Curated annotation (Swiss-Prot):
PANTHER family: ELONGATION FACTOR P, ELONGATION FACTOR P (EF-P) FAMILY PROTEIN. NCBIfam families: efp, PRK00529.1. Involved in peptide bond synthesis. Stimulates efficient translation and peptide-bond synthesis on native or reconstituted 70S ribosomes in vitro. Probably functions indirectly by altering the affinity of the ribosome for aminoacyl-tRNA, thus increasing their reactivity as acceptors for peptidyl transferase. This is Elongation factor P. Coiled coil: none annotated.
Length: 185
């Protein structure tokens, strides 16, 4: 059992028969009354997100999540296909469940598949990935305003803000946790 006050982003727990992943968690102390935990949660099975509050002392059953190394094979229609790199078993995951993760991976990329018992519940991507700029505005000579930048569409469809000197065709390192530009590759 785990108390609501100990729940952090990324943790998974069971409540009311649902498997729930914490997206955001924060303590909130109103001017009057007891402390509450405000949380943004995702139902792992349906993909729906919702906001809720809990008392800090409420207890939940922490879900045991196992991960296995896998390779992203391809996407067809509404299904993404992955292969366990140890056993060569293949897994089909609805695109709706891994839509955000697919923005960071290319075919044949290494990932980790998450299991709850024998049920596939998600994919973990590396903390940084290397992607190529598919489209961006041309650089303007003399544009030296610091902190500006421009949007760039990467080969997976992800749009990130990049410095003005970045051009189409360049490879970039992207932080997958925040979806931000780190450096040129």
């Amino acid at each position: 059992m785990i108390e609501a006050s100990k729940l952090k982003a990324g943790m998974t727990f069971e409540a009311e028969g649902k498997l729930i992943r914490v997206l955001e968690a924060s303590h909130h102390k109103p001017g009057k009354g007891n402390t509450i935990m405000r949380m943004k949660l995702r139902d792992v099975r349906t993909g729906s997100t919702f906001d809720t509050t809990y008392r800090p002392d409420e207890k939940f059953e922490q879900a045991i999540i196992e991960t296995v190394p896998a390779q992203y094979l391809y996407k067809m229609d509404d299904t993404a296909y992955f292969m366990n790199t140890d056993t060569y078993d293949q897994y089909e995951i609805p695109v709706a469940n891994v839509e955000q993760e697919l923005l960071y991976i290319l075919e044949n990329s290494n990932v980790k598949i998450q299991f709850y018992g024998s049920e596939v519940i998600g994919v973990t991507v590396p903390t940084t990935v290397e992607l190529t700029v598919a489209e961006t505005q041309p650089s303007i000579k003399g544009a030296t305003v610091t902190g500006s930048g421009k949007p760039a569409t990467l080969e997976t469809g992800l749009v990130v803000n990049v410095p003005d000197f970045i051009e189409a065709g360049q490879k970039l390192i992207i932080n997958t946790a925040e979806g931000t530009y780190v450096s040129r590759a």
